[in-house]
């Protein structure tokens, strides 16, 4: 007797009892889509969201306005631009409720196909174009820092000029608040530039390079306040050139000597002292890391685009605006600029949202970030995806694979991003990504038919049995074989399976790009501030007493008298040290801060210096200098909390 057995798995065509026993995964039905999402007429869209579904004539679209952000997963050739970005721009530009857009556009394709459509529909169209810098708008990435520091200078000046004591206190507090915000902005920018993918094994070098950048930005601002440089000299390229010039031994000593004249409590002094006093080998290693991160600002195209600003950083929240950032995708160095620009604009827009009554931007914003995982990590991305929606901002992150996202942010942070976003699957060539999508879809329960047959010379018996088994809704291999299809995972309901649709199918799309003004690229060397330009005599010329009114001169003199009390204890201590020796005591003022200067022909012993330092170091910054043959002691009161 011969026995044959055949097992036949089938998708059941009739109702299966206990149909969820091994899994209940399925795709969303049209009735569920119609219930969960808002239907709009393509020609008359009221509020744009993510396009979940279309009718067969592409005249109606169902929008998802609930999912806060989206991650698009598509390898090269998946049609991200023509089936996702351009259609979304068509809906966005034509919607009655206007939103702004920030679009990274590596090839310039999005600009070429959508810019005229945006302009014709009332949008301000801006470009930051590193491919064609002669056609680009300008964006000095230090602009928010400069503006905040100028507020500090303005309020400080007002605190001197006004006679009302209550107002003096008010302006002084505003000045200190702006100074603190300036320092926060400096730290944030330096972190964006110096941050590595994931976390470096030895963060010392990156942290030190960041500290060097913070100090140099602070130094340029202080020189601007003193009147030693002009506003247009405060650029990242100028800072890069200054650091290059300081590598010359003679220049380094000159810079170090000049820095010694600055007071503790200044950004430059506090940040640079520990860096430039490091050992020679350590300092060279720090500047090597600094140079590798800052080298992109040597690029003539980058220097021209970032030499000034011709629009406000928060314009996207004030009026319907589309900003295209066009970067050469063949050179990943430029992607650093995308991260910096996104980080800066996002921070300024959050500040704008926070002063609105409802804490939301008047014109809400979609960030369409192509090649997101090719960019260096965006600082505080976890916080961004958690709170951006409440400020009126929605992010669209385009990546090629999950592994690419993990490589940039690490698995933990990458998971936080994914947990806060809907997912759009377009195409993958990697098995790991296909397996992850299959896992997300889950398993369904299907019937499995088993057929047994026995045959002999005299008899034939047949037997068929049916059982239930689990099956992937789509297997990894099936997912990899999909063409012109997409799988959408919104935060509401089951996943959605539909065709990808070209932008030309939609009646709201209008082709064309705008003509941009062509400017001449410049040799900007005349704007660079380098070590050779330092003039020691200029270091304290802001608000020179001789240039102030009599009332303000009197105010400064009164302040000096009041501040003497701050130094009473150390003054008395040093009087005991020098009780049998003639010495001179002077109270001086620099940048509206009083310090105690002591000079004596008697040099202090190492023991005296140690005793003074250990006794008063918590309250004062103390500098000892005897290089001139005199003992000079400069004592600065520590401003606690600043």
Residue ranges with predicted function:
Residues 385-387, 391-487:
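Conserved ATP-driven motor cores of ASCE-family P-loop NTPases powering translocation/secretion/packaging/pilus
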Residues 1-78, 82-90, 95-97, 134, ...:
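Basic- and hydrophobic-enriched, low-structure N-terminal and domain-boundary segments
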Residues 579-595:
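Short edge beta-strands and adjacent turn/loop segments
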Residues 51-57, 61-393, 408-411, 478-483, ...:
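P-loop NTPase motor domains
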Residues 592-613:
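Acidic, low-complexity, intrinsically disordered interaction modules
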Residues 630-639:
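C-terminal edge-of-domain segments
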Residues 618-628:
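Conserved short beta-strand edge segments in small beta-sheet-based binding/regulatory domains
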Residues 256, 557-560, 567, 571-578, ...:
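Residue-level detector of alpha-helical secondary structure
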């Amino acid at each position: 007797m011969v026995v044959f057995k055949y097992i036949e798995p089938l998708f059941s065509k009739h109702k299966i009892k206990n149909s969820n026993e091994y899994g209940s995964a399925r795709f969303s039905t049209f009735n569920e889509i119609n219930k969960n999402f808002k239907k709009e007429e393509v020609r008359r869209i009221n509020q744009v969201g993510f396009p979940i579904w279309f009718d067969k004539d592409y005249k109606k679209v169902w929008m998802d306005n609930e999912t806060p952000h989206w991650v698009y997963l598509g390898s090269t050739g998946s049609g991200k631009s023509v089936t996702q970005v351009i259609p979304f721009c068509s809906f966005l530009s034509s919607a009655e409720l206007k939103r702004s857009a920030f679009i990274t556009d590596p090839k310039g394709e999005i600009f070429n196909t959508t810019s005229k459509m945006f302009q014709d529909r009332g949008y301000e169209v801006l470009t930051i174009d590193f491919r064609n810098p002669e056609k680009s708008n300008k964006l000095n990435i230090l602009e928010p820092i400069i503006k905040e520091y100028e507020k500090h200078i303005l309020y400080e000046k007002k605190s001197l000029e006004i006679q009302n004591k209550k107002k003096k206190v008010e302006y002084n507090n505003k000045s200190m608040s702006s100074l603190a915000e300036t320092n926060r902005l400096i730290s944030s920018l330096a972190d964006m530039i110096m941050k590595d993918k994931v976390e470096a094994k030895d963060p010392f070098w990156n942290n030190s390079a960041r500290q060097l950048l913070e100090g140099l930005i602070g130094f340029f601002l202080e020189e601007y306040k003193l009147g030693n440089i002009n506003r247009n000299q405060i650029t990242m390229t100028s800072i890069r050139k200054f650091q290059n010039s300081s590598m010359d031994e003679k220049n380094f000593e000159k810079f170090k000597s000049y820095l010694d004249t600055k007071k503790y409590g200044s950004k430059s002094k506090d940040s640079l002292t520990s860096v430039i006093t490091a050992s020679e080998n350590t300092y060279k290693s720090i500047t090597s890391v600094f140079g590798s991160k800052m080298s992109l600002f040597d690029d003539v195209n980058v220097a021209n685009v970032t030499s000034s600003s011709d629009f406000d950083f928060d314009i996207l929240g004030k009026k319907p605006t589309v900003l295209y950032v066009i970067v050469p995708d063949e050179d990943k160095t430029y992607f650093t600029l995308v991260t910096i620009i996104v980080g800066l604009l996002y921070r300024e827009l959050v500040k704008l949202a926070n002063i609105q009554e409802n804490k939301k931007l008047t014109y809400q914003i979609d960030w369409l970030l192509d090649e997101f995982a090719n960019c260096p990590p965006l600082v505080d991305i976890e916080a961004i995806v958690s709170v951006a929606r409440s400020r009126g901002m929605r992010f669209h992150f385009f990546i090629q694979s999950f592994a690419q996202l993990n490589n940039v942010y690490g698995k933990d942070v990458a998971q936080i991003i994914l947990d806060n976003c809907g997912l759009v699957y377009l195409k993958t060539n990697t098995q790991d990504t296909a397996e992850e999508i299959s896992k997300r879809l889950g398993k369904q329960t299907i019937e499995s038919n088993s057929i047994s047959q026995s045959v002999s010379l005299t008899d034939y018996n047949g037997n068929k049995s049916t059982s239930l088994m689990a099956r992937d809704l789509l297997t990894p291999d099936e997912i990899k074989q999909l063409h012109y299809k997409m799988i959408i995972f919104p935060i509401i309901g089951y996943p959605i399976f539909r065709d990808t649709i070209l932008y030309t199918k939609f009646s709201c799309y209008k082709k064309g790009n705008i003509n941009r003004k062509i400017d001449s690229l410049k040799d900007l060397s005349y704007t660079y501030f380098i070590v050779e330009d330092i003039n020691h005599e200029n270091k304290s010329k802001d608000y020179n007493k001789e240039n102030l009114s009599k009332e303000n001169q009197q105010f400064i003199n009164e302040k000096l008298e009041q501040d003497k009390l701050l130094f009473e204890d150390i003054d008395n201590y040093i009087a005991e040290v020098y009780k049998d020796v003639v010495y001179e005591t002077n109270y001086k003022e620099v940048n509206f801060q009083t310090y105690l200067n002591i000079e004596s022909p008697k040099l202090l012993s190492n023991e005296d210096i140690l005793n003074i330092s250990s006794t008063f170091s918590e309250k004062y910054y103390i500098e000892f200098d005897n290089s001139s043959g005199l003992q000079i002691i400069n004592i600065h009161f520590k401003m606690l909390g600043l």
